[in-house]
């Protein structure tokens, strides 16, 4: 019976679609690989649905990580029962039915994991005693493995007969909106916080009655995580078109006031200004170097008298400097942490000593000047402006203490600096001097070594001390903006290259499939060539994930950068000609204001002075025309 099955040649048993099926599995696996940062904040929505009626009993949304976004859910028992139940009079259609439901105990049985003998949906997964895992009954049902616990909430003593306040008069004591007098509280257990909520979980609920059949209802609990969808390309491949030379500085012209049209002329719609052109590669590189120079010139003017600033052409292009700073605690996720992201971005070089949080291993304790342990509780640690948390799971602007307490993660507070080296003029001159002279290995000073700690030690410590602090903040923010723009353009370039590679691989796969169809009788292309089959493993999914990670981190840094600006600084960023206009008219306005303030006082002083001098002159004239008589002495 089995002989003929093994008597055929081996190539006849090769499924011609096998390579394509395996290839599709490999590609799908490569694309679906996700490297979630445990500190990433998502918009999580929990939804409790009555499966008997399809209505939503509760929908709660909050911002949090995948580890600590497990709130308490409040809803009413009548949201799960409905107007009518198995028997007449047990529903929540009337106030009496709602009040009667409050007198019964209830128990809940899980439908996501049904033990043997517990039945199915018809029995509410409570086919026998012992299947219940939670509820509110005299025997106190409980479980160590179920995902939730469901108990009754606090019912006011003056609740009354569960009247609906929207139907009856307001004078009836205890009436509530909708007649909701059976509050329930759903909490997640430790097992529920560790479980996978990729799909809905189902439970059955039954009212306990001493006689008769216990009525059944079913509900589901679903978690929905909102995330930013994929970005679809439209138009030609912009990989090469983005490589633009440095643009010439454009002279800013003040806008002219609109001229009124002549009488009888047709109205002309003004043309809109063309959109601003994106900076090219040369502009971005020059902005990085210019921002580095501005920050260095402010902090160390002696070093910028004559120097060379060189942008490193090889990776790593950025480095981190550990700093000490004061983070802020938030009970809920801040706005700059709410952008959804999927993947990790790390730093290959971190120097200095700064603030560390979590369980730092011995190999990285040299980066820590101060190590703080997080206390129990669920809150978020937001990095100060200009800094970011460098964790072993990736870069993030916020930390979740729940993740730190449950894992062995650690984070260091760092500043992000471009890899710009500083050289003295002597070093550059020696590179062009003639003659074979022995040269020492130069000591490369990077921008991180020269300006490390500027955010926390220089600018942040001097905030509010005057004009110097304001100028320092502006120079540092200029460098931050240049770094942000450069990272954004690098992300776009790599994303475009990844798309080109994916398109090329799709063409190759189509050719491979066509050849397999042509050699279908021979068992496929590999069998016809009598060679080992090679399968293409596409790792562009990981590239796409990391680029999405970088894009979202850039958005977070942009929001943090904008939130750190005051109203006065943001006023100058609204329009390109606003700064020039203000600087032009500010001087005359200040002079006019000073004249209006101090002019009357000065004029009064001047008039009084003139009057005094005139009085003195008049007195001198009178004394010259008359002389004083000598007194005559009379003899007695």
Curated annotation (Swiss-Prot):
Motif CX6CC: where in chain: 526-534
Quaternary organization: The mature envelope protein (Env) consists of a trimer of SU-TM heterodimers attached by a labile interchain disulfide bond.
Region listing for Receptor-binding domain (RBD), in residue ranges: 32-233
Organism: Mink cell focus-forming murine leukemia virus
GO cellular component labels: host cell plasma membrane; membrane; viral envelope; virion membrane
Positions of short motif CXXC: 307-310
Claim: Signal is one of the keywords in the record: yes
GN (gene name): env
Biological function: The surface protein (SU) attaches the virus to the host cell by binding to its receptor. This interaction triggers the refolding of the transmembrane protein (TM) and is thought to activate its fusogenic potential by unmasking its fusion peptide. Fusion occurs at the host cell plasma membrane. The transmembrane protein (TM) acts as a class I viral fusion protein. Under the current model, the protein has at least 3 conformational states: pre-fusion native state, pre-hairpin intermediate state, and post-fusion hairpin state. During viral and target cell membrane fusion, the coiled coil regions (heptad repeats) assume a trimer-of-hairpins structure, positioning the fusion peptide in close proximity to the C-terminal region of the ectodomain. The formation of this structure appears to drive apposition and subsequent fusion of viral and target cell membranes.
Pro residues compositional bias, start-end: 255-264
InterPro entries: FMuLV_rcpt-bd, TLV/ENV_coat_polyprotein
Residues on Cytoplasmic side: 603-636
Protein name (record): Envelope glycoprotein
Keyword entries, A-Z: Cleavage on pair of basic residues, Coiled coil, Disulfide bond, Fusion of virus membrane with host cell membrane, Fusion of virus membrane with host membrane, Glycoprotein, Host cell membrane, Host membrane, Host-virus interaction, Lipoprotein, Membrane, Palmitate, Signal, Transmembrane, Transmembrane helix, Viral attachment to host cell, Viral envelope protein, Viral penetration into host cytoplasm, Virion, Virus entry into host cell
Record-annotated disulphide pairs: 109-126, 118-131, 307-310, 307-534, 337-391, 356-368, 398-411, 526-533
Region (Fusion peptide): 443-463
Lipid positions (S-palmitoyl cysteine): 601
Span list, region Immunosuppression: 509-525
Domain characteristics, as noted in the entry: The 17 amino acids long immunosuppressive region is present in many retroviral envelope proteins. Synthetic peptides derived from this relatively conserved sequence inhibit immune function in vitro and in vivo. The YXXL motif is involved in determining the exact site of viral release at the surface of infected mononuclear cells and promotes endocytosis.
